[in-house]
Amino acid sequence: ETDVHQLVCKGALQEILSVCTQVRYSGEVVPLDDNMLRRVKRVTDTLNRQGLRVVAVATKYLPAREGDYQRIDESDLILEGYIAFLDPPKETTAPALKALKASGITVKILTGDSELVAAKVCHEVGLDAGDVVIGSNIEGLSDDELATLAQRTTLFARLTPMHKERIVTLLKREGHVVGFMGDGINDAPALRAADIGISVDGAVDIAREAADIILLEKSLMVLEEGVIEGRRTFSNMLKYIKMTASSNFGNVFSVLVASAFLPFLPMLPLHLLIQNLLYDVSQVAIPFDNVDEEQIKKPQRWNPSELGRFMIFFGPISSIFDILTFCLM
């Protein structure tokens, strides 16, 4: 009919049910009462337990008009049915999670999906979900309460984008370094809030723009490989900083001691620069140096006080050789 438009809506089951007042059952439109809601939930819960995601479809006939339809039009809909589809985890998910755990990384699941679907997926990939927390249960919690809950909970389900962002922010506040991986529009706020936002090349544009790293490989094992390489690079970088700082401190200490006892300066500024240049050449091999296994398996943090202790201890030791040389001069 040219004077009538059919509005078709699809989305998460709970969201669609909230705007439906009728349901098409056995070819007839009947009221969506409590009894019918229980029947719908019973069927969809069975599908969710099998790991199937459910998308509800609803319709409504409206008088034809010009222009776009608004959110207010999405009311008094007729529930036509639902579509169940399987979105299995990647084959590399289970070994990647196992490898990350072995590297001291705690994995948490923050999803907008049903808690039944999420729990099924966690079971398939070997992740112990424990007690599931859903989004509606965290809205009334204070930041301190949610921070405590977030640290001991593995699986959060039925989350909104703001829920995800809040959890990530609170985990950071508690001193954790947080990496968040997502590929959808709903993941963008959490990707921005995380220390490291990770997405994939097939993600929506807004997720790729919000991410710090985009994975081009299909295998999730690249995450563990990236962690190992990052820790190796960080360890070797610390070696360079410690060696350079202690060397420079030792040189300055040597000059100060010499100026107190010798009538001349044993090392001019040019000598120090040449010495540092030669020293830097010897440090070219540091990026390729081996790193102890315990340093790779355990996350490390930047600790300035440790650098200070190293510099104060090894700097004067190197100065001993300088001072002995000055005495011979």
List the predicted regions and their residue ranges.
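Cytosolic catalytic headpieces and adjacent flexible linkers of membrane translocases
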Residues: 1-170, 174, 188, 200-202, ...
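Membrane-embedded transport module
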Residues: 129-180, 194-329
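Basic, alpha-helical nucleic-acid-binding regions used in initiation and control of genome expression
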Residues: 191
